[in-house]
Amino acid sequence: MKLIYTEMSYSMTEILVNEARKAADQGYRVFYIAPNSLSFEKEREVLTLLPERGTFSIIVTRFVQMSRYFTVESSPSKQHLDDTTLAMIFYRALMQLKPEDLPSYGRLQNNSVFIEQLVELYKELKNAQLSVHDLTGLDHPQKQEDLIKIIELAETIMIQQDYNQDSPLQSFARAIKLGLLNNQLSKTVIVIDGFSRFSAEEDYLLSLLNNNCQEVIIGSYVSQKAYQKSFIKGNIYEASLHFLQDLAQKYHIKPVFATSNQVFKPAFSRLTQLFEATHDFSQVDWQLQKNDLDHFSLWQCHHQKEEIEHVAKSIRQKLYEGYRYKDILVLLGDMDAYQLQIGPIFDKFEIPYYLGKAEPMAAHPLVQFIESLERSQRYNWRREDILNMLKSGLFGCFDDSDIDRFEEYTQFADIKGFTKFSKPFTINSSRQYPLDFLNEMRQDIVLPLQELFKSQKQLGASLIDKLILFLEKIRLAENMQGLAQSQLEVEKNEEVWKRFTDILTSFHHIFGQEKLRLSDCLALIKTGMKSAQYRVVPATLDVVTIKSYDLVQPHSKPFVYAIGLTQSHFPKQIHHSGLLSDQERARINEIRNYRHFDIASAENSKKNHQTALSLFNAATKELVLSVPTVINETFDDLSPYLKELINFGLPLLDKGKNYLSYDNSDIGNYKALLSQIIAINRQDLIEMSDQDKMFWTVVLRYLRKQLRKQQLELPTSDYRLSTKPLSKEVIEVCFPKGIPLKLSATALTVFYNNQYNYFLKYVLNLNKTESIHPDSRIHGQYLHRVFERLMKDHTQEPFDNKLKQAIYHTNQESFFQQVYQDNAEAEYSLAILEDIVRSTAPILQLNQNIKVIDQEKNFHLDMGNEILVHGIIDRIDQLSDGSLGIVDYKSSANQFDIGTFYNGLSPQLVTYLAALKQIAPHDINQLFGAMYLHLQDPKLDLVTFKQIDNTLVESIYKALTYKGIFSEVEKEHLSTGAYQTKNALYSNDELETLLNYNKYLYLKAAKHIKKGHFLINPYTSDGKTVQGDQLKAITRFEADLDMAQARRLVTLPAKEKKECFLTLMRKESRL
């Protein structure tokens, strides 16, 4: 064995490549070993350093891959064990054990997290060269007993199913020990680069290779100053020193110092020496030179998005200077926090990148499909799960519009559960759903699922056969091929499909002869899919590489950007959270001889120093270290390592917000520039200098010119929220000339509530989602129907009998039967409605001097100027003197307020008076009023009554009164009825004023509607809060930001309120 160390200013790779070349020139076969995470990049670096740029004598690979070169022909043809297969084996083992067999873990038998921890422990045991019987000294002896039972049973299953329990390194080591590879290894040289420690498995293999190979050469970075130190605790080279010292002591070799021809910039070397002096308690009498600072930058940004955008701009600048994407490396302090953001931002700046991390399959449509399938079976055809299966795009041949229509109907009819999905859809609504089409679609969905879900407990092989048959029926494979929109997506789908078929194969192999329920089968496949990962190789090498900063090696790229280096992530603190604690691992590690657990937490300090050292020397030209103030919406501090750099004299640059300028980094990329222009166009103006304003004025003028050529535009507005007028063509279609504009009292109220709401409801005809479950609208229809029947009954039957008959016949109507007899909740609603009817009906019995002229009367009121107002009057009453009035049933409390009417928010009663005047063309003297009747079951607080007497009954009837507008002329006739006339009496002239102003409201609204420009202007009564419909989900209206756009209502003092509003009405209606 040969041990080599060198300073950070030299290239260890060049030194080891020279050693490899010498061995290759002598006829030896050379394996150049790199860590798993660096083998691809190391191969490119090694081949670059070779004069011939390639050779068959030097193979750059990993330990595991090297073992396959030697054992590929002699290895037994057994099944391969991966994490998913291991999890299935442990699940099968736990199935065969009873809870009482496992005192410590019996309650966790079906826990997926516990099974994952078992898999991790089993892999750790293999890497540590330990068996489950070596787990002595645990905190609780029963833990070892349980683990022995579980793992031994799992290993028995592996033997039965012909799985290879040995890892590739174990198989390689066994072949070496048996002497099967002596001839090959005698002609082999092993070169090892990039390691600072070996696992127990690698350590054992290395001892065998050292005895059988021609030579083993290992290199590591250690400074000569550190190598000569006797006390190395806390030294930045502590990990490498321990690594070399252990090997030197074990193999009785003295490490040799070497140098390379390539010497990196002295700025990095001087920074390293300062860093080393800080941690070995020595002194230096110099500082970084001014020109050294040109190679380092410390950035501070407010949050991650700004940080990534600054990096993207800097990368674009490097390209402008002539460098290539492959010269740039981006390191992330927290992969999970940055992974979702960095992709879209780099795409915006048109920067191709490769993320050096396996992607989880959990977000792929195939995994979502399998998860929805499993949940559909487990939760008995829950609607959300069935729809998620369809929306994955992998079930059957359905268009998006078909799926939307199916979803709309199932929500309306509340279809959930197998019983409802299995029956034909028969319920319809006013929207007239295409039931024939929906039933055909229902059958295409239900039949294959029903065939699969009716599977009873049976052999796993039979379940897999039925599952595959189901997947063939729904054309899963064909649909999977149709998902991809690009070559990259094709490659991703191929990798996902391969993992899926591997999981099915493993399940068939392990559980083929075991009896299982379908739910267990689907749950196992789902778990395997959700935990699986895949990796896609970039289509070109000229990309920006992105990876975690703790995987970096010295001198990786010319330009390195390390971002997210906050105190929480730099340095990283790693802790085990498995079935064994670190204390238990330490006790087990007392057994040596190549057998030991890796305890990451015990090596945090020296590993973090080694990582920081590699990071500070990762670049060969320029290193940028960046830290956000806020990461994952949490404030974080500077890393202690960055604070050391600041003490060395490196300035911390506050990058601030991404204000646009005319620097190359801001305007050098068209796509990024356009996106920033749009972003600025949506926000408040920022302060600019005169020079900036002039520049951006010219740029905007040029951009608009280019956008016009592409038929695009940048919208401008004086308000944060604005709307565009409808085009002339649309106005002509929506409001054709010669055809009256149809309005109603409800439509007018909506218009004056918020014009944009009118546009959505009556121009676009958007409606809320319907439901078969009764709501306030259906409740109102029921009450109307009962009272309509009751008032039509002119027989001599007692009133109570009439009421019972009206309720009975209304309940027998098919529509109300479907609505109110669907479930217990609907039946309860019906019982409450019947109570309301019985409570309200006596008011009709008391007013015997009233004659009902008509009910549910349709009317069309001509307002002039091509405006036609339509509606339905619930009831027209006639007093004994022949005067007519209108009753409008309400399921909630309503009362006419002249101020609300003036502001256009309560035109219903006055509109009905105008309609009645047109229907019965008599003068105003023959109208006694228009009123609301609140259909209710009055609630009284009995605490306020001293005794149960007539006052209680009077209070009930007081709540059951007509409230609205009444003619002062009919005051005497109204006094004997249940009419609340206080502050509600109007003279004939005042009634005429109300009618005239009502017409003015319609004309004013119609004029605005026909212009086709609808404002977002919900009303406010006080200028502080908004009471109108804000439609936040659509308009993004915010009261604190958009109060200026709200319509302020006219309000007047309560004193003389009626007279003042009538004066305003006369004035405005005459204009």
From Swiss-Prot:
Cofactor(s) needed: Mg(2+)
Known EC number: 3.1.-.-
GO molecular function, one term: helicase activity
Pfam families: ADDB_N, PDDEXK_1
SUPFAM superfamilies: P-loop containing nucleoside triphosphate hydrolases, Restriction endonuclease-like
Matching InterPro entries: ADDB_N, DNA_helicase_suRexB, P-loop_NTPase, PDDEXK-like_dom_sf, PDDEXK_AddAB-type, Restrct_endonuc-II-like
Family annotation (Gene3D superfamilies): 3.90.320.10, P-loop containing nucleotide triphosphate hydrolases
Keywords recorded for this protein, A-Z: ATP-binding, DNA damage, DNA repair, DNA-binding, Exonuclease, Helicase, Hydrolase, Nuclease, Nucleotide-binding
A biological process from GO: double-strand break repair via homologous recombination
NCBIfam families xrefs: rexB_recomb
Alphabetical list of HAMAP family matching this protein: AddB_type2
Role summary: The heterodimer acts as both an ATP-dependent DNA helicase and an ATP-dependent, dual-direction single-stranded exonuclease. Recognizes the chi site generating a DNA molecule suitable for the initiation of homologous recombination. This subunit has 5' -> 3' nuclease activity but not helicase activity.
Similarity section: Belongs to the helicase family. AddB/RexB type 2 subfamily.
Subunit structure of this chain's protein: Heterodimer of AddA and RexB.
Further comment found in the protein's record: Despite having helicase-like domains, this subunit does not have helicase activity.
Record protein name field: ATP-dependent helicase/deoxyribonuclease subunit B
Source organism: Streptococcus pyogenes serotype M12 (strain MGAS9429)
Gene label: rexB
